[in-house]
Amino acid sequence: MESKSHAHCFRAQRVLHGKQWQQDAVVTVDENGTISAIESYDGQRHADAIPLGPVDLMPGLIDSHVHGSQGCDVMDATHDSLNTMSRYFATLGVTAFVATTVTAPVAKIRAALAQVAKSKHDGVDGAEILGAYLEGPYFTEKNKGAHPTQWFRELAVEELEDWISYSDNQLLKVALAPEKTGALDAIRYLDAHGIHVMLGHSDADYEQVKAALAAGAKGIVHCYNGMRGLHHRDPGVVGAGLLHPHCFVEMIADGHHVHPAAIDVAHRCCGSRMTLITDAMRATGMPDGQYTLGEYQVDMKQGVVMTSSGGLAGSTLTLLRGVKNIHRWLNVPIEQAWLMASYTPAESLGIQHQLGSLEVGKYASMVAVSSDFSIEKTWVKGRLVFDAATSPRQEALCI
């Protein structure tokens, strides 16, 4: 095979090409880390192809809502923490993530946003940092979750400008409660600046959520959790989010936050708009014990993290485990479950033309997956960032 000096051609037993499987196929990656060809294997033309063995090549997973792992958190505001998270995620098939903050004093949020931007610019060793997700401080008390109310703030465009500035224009998403004063103006402002607004930690009614979505909001935060639920006389945040044809629906598929049957109901309503997330915090991949989530001290027992008052406080889910759960609970093909954690997150961020599926012209952010669903290799934009043959697997550590 003729190729450019730094191009590579990988052969796998199957390649998830777009949304369909291609048997015994090769993926050619150019020197820029972009996929230049996906085609059936030909012994003569692909004589130099790197044989990956009996694996499936699939798009890298994208965690669009994650706080931490391995004892580290975005709110640490350090490169070491973000890099540790990045390396850990790569071992589990995640090739990109959105670093998510929590409600905290303004100075701490500013520091976290600034560090996310710096680490994205400087680069990390594993999964790439796509940008920042501001989760809080624009919530309301009734469905606060693990967000301390003393640090809640009122919406003001000037403050939104401040967050954007501290993030060096790397702020991708903002979560807010649509019933707050000034919410619609804030949504319109953020939408005009290309920042995706998610609705959550909210007691808004159906009409308020409909108005927010009409104003430009793009989705709802971890569906069912931290929001007014679905009632036959009051459809609430859940009902509005599931019904709106363009609303992305975040879902934590760990079996603790949402019952599998409720996930099935949501999926039957929103279909491909369901976006698998982890909402994982620093206890992910760690033993049971005490940890911090923002300003809270929390306890993890058997992988479930709770506040002292008994509320859930983030998760210890991995995106790979979430995909497995969806595949099993909803009885959908593995490729369909996988795309809920790769293509749909990319689409929700408006980057589906770059990431989320394996197609010509997109980045070669991809993973080699064995028959037992373990990750063998992970590439980010054509660069090998994890190889199970030389590094320990991590999934066994994760709850």
Curated annotation (Swiss-Prot):
Alphabetically ordered keywords of this record: Carbohydrate metabolism, Hydrolase, Metal-binding
Gene Ontology biological-process entries: N-acetylglucosamine catabolic process; N-acetylneuraminate catabolic process
UniProt pathway: Amino-sugar metabolism; N-acetylneuraminate degradation; D-fructose 6-phosphate from N-acetylneuraminate: step 4/5
UniProt EC number: 3.5.1.25
Needed cofactors: a divalent metal cation
Active site: 279 (proton donor/acceptor)
Domain of life from the UniProt record: Bacteria
Residues binding substrate: 146-147, 225-226, 233, 254-257, 312-314
Binding note for cofactor: Binds 2 divalent metal cations per subunit.
Catalytically driven reaction(s): N-acetyl-D-glucosamine 6-phosphate + H2O = D-glucosamine 6-phosphate + acetate
Coiled coil: none
UniProt similarity note: Belongs to the metallo-dependent hydrolases superfamily. NagA family.
Described purpose of this protein according to its UniProt entry: Involved in the first committed step in the biosynthesis of amino-sugar-nucleotides. Catalyzes the hydrolysis of the N-acetyl group of N-acetylglucosamine-6-phosphate (GlcNAc-6-P) to yield glucosamine 6-phosphate and acetate.
NCBIfam families: nagA
Protein name, UniProt field: N-acetylglucosamine-6-phosphate deacetylase
